[in-house]
Design a protein with these regions (language model features):
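A membrane-interface helix-boundary motif in multi-pass transporters
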Residues: 119-137
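Structural signature of the two symmetry-related core transmembrane helices
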Residues: 38-53
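Helix-loop junctions at membrane interfaces in 12-TM secondary transporters
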Residues: 56-67
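Helix-to-loop junctions at the C-terminal end of transmembrane segments
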Residues: 22-36, 121
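Loop-to-transmembrane helix entry
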Residues: 2-18
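Loop-to-transmembrane helix entry/capping segments in MFS-fold secondary transporters
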Residues: 5, 92-102
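Multi-pass alpha-helical transporter architecture, strongest
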Residues: 133-162
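Intracellular juxtamembrane helix-capping segments at the cytosolic ends
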Residues: 77-90
Length: 162
């Protein structure tokens, strides 16, 4: 199952491209049906399943490639959906501040997640990282039921936002 590091792109590039291409249908559905929060919840569940499967199904390159594709679909949809929700929920005058706080906490989360993931992997093995991620996703999934679909802005195309 070993793939030399110089060939990792053989797996990652197709997974990233597939994830990018397949993120469009859920995003379009969420916008057209005013179901962005529903799509977000679905993708949180989608990633939870992916993390659990990562803990068990990393025996072949094909399994890894498939799971990476699943991961990147969920990740890309959430990466587009979350700032969208923040900008819709925040008052117009505070939208820039809200997005700044979002981006700052996102970067803090990258650091903390990387540090915790490394410590967990070192002490309990790589499978434990996936289980901890799945558990965190379940907490996020449960807490997402407090969210309501934000109102769609009522403005004409090309109208200046005030």
């Amino acid at each position: 199952m070993r793939l030399p590091s110089e060939h990792h792109w053989w797996v990652y590039l197709p997974a990233v491209i597939a994830g990018f291409a397949l993120m469009a249908p859920p995003l379009i559905f969420g916008e057209k049906k005013q179901a962005v929060v529903l799509v977000m919840r679905f993708m949180i569940g989608f990633l939870t399943v992916a993390f659990v499967l990562f803990a068990y199904l990393i025996h072949s390159i094909w399994e890894i490639a498939f799971l990476l594709g699943i991961f990147f679909i969920g990740f890309n949809v959430l990466e587009a959906t979350l700032p969208n929700l923040v900008s819709r929920i925040a008052p117009a005058a505070d939208r820039g501040l809200a997005l700044g706080v979002y981006n700052t906490t996102q970067n803090i989360g990258l650091f903390v997640g990387g540090a915790l993931g490394g410590a967990i992997s070192q002490h309990f093995g790589p499978e434990a990282v996936f289980f901890v991620c799945a558990f965190a996703m379940l907490i996020w999934f449960a807490s997402s039921f407090g969210l309501q679909e934000p109102a769609r802005p009522n403005r004409e195309p090309g109208e200046v936002i005030k």
